[in-house]
Amino acid sequence: MTPGAEQKPFIVDGTGQSLSYCELCARLVAAQPFRSVCHARGAAEIFYQVALALSRGRRLLLVDPELKPHEIEQLGVDRESPEENLAPFTLPDVASLLERCRTSEGFELELLTSGSTGLPKRVVHRFAGLTRFLRTSARHRDDVWGLCYNPTHIAGVQVFLQAFLNANTMIDLFGQSPATIQQRIVEHGVTHLSATPTFYRLLLAEVRQPLPQVRAVTLGGEASDPALHARLREIFPSARIANLYASTEAGTLFASDGDTFFPAEGIAKLIAIEQGTLRLHRSLLGEFQGAGDVSEWYDTGDKVEIVATEPLRFRFVGRDRDWINLGGEKVNPQEVEAQLVQFPGVTAARVFGRKNSVVGQILCAEVVTTGARDETALRDFLAARLHAIKVPRLITFVSALPSSRTGKLLRS
């Protein structure tokens, strides 16, 4: 344990207020009563409640504070969950807290899927699954994590666990402007970032100076592209850059070498790729609540391209539901976006389908650029690199692209 860990900030929230590990321990010891549903606003309060459930071996449901009361009711969630009085206990120091959490029995964390294809589902995770690929050792004791994800979603929880179990500080960057994010990275000495490609594209559009103190940059949640990686290497020259694959249903499963993913040791036999679609064995999944029996193989909806079979290596090419049907021809929007961001000055792009009475849908693009808004030159550039059907019929220049609460690009 780092000397002085008690005084180290546990988290610095979006307003600049901090909660130290010493203060966290005091709150955990004094906590009464315990409620099994967390509908709090703010990462500091949310992660305090997760730490409480973890240290006491309890089950906790995290509910996004942006969910409306009727949506919560549809999920069968009782926001006024019964109170439970907790038995007294002591925490002499932070090391005792972390040891108690690592050996806690009975802890379960219930999360909601993003609900991008309907009402969210409830998925229960246990400590072993949530920490499957976390690294805890003395070499990580000085890491400072930027929290770029929604704290009620799987990616945010895993950033919390990686930081918390090493007694690291988290700096809340979620929902902040690019200028504020850059300022807070410098001010608080952030060394590790984990975020979606959309988050990085929005940030890089504003950042002009390198940030050499950042040592690790991880991308997840969406497909990335070589142009983004090149730009990340410019702004974060000291950082190791990697992609990760995680989902609310399964947690983190794959790491990457560039844009090529590989399963962690021991789970290769629990991965199947059929007709380009990634499937996971149900033993890798959390427990679905109220969904009946889950079939043996779970369809992730992710389309992949196999690079090698022994050992298994593959690339993600997009989400099955994101493909756009243009008069019978299916187009992967991420393929078009990858070409758009190759055009000089283009920092981000969104490709989507718009309803059309003749062909069903037409291909549209929104583009963020720091250069001249030359649509003709951009169309010529795309025409030289893509089949004609993949060149958007409608191109609109915009100042920013919409993103979801999970930090991903909104396509609908």
Identify the residue ranges that each predicted region occupies:
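Conserved AMP-binding/adenylate-forming core of the ANL superfamily
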Residues: 3-33, 72, 125-128
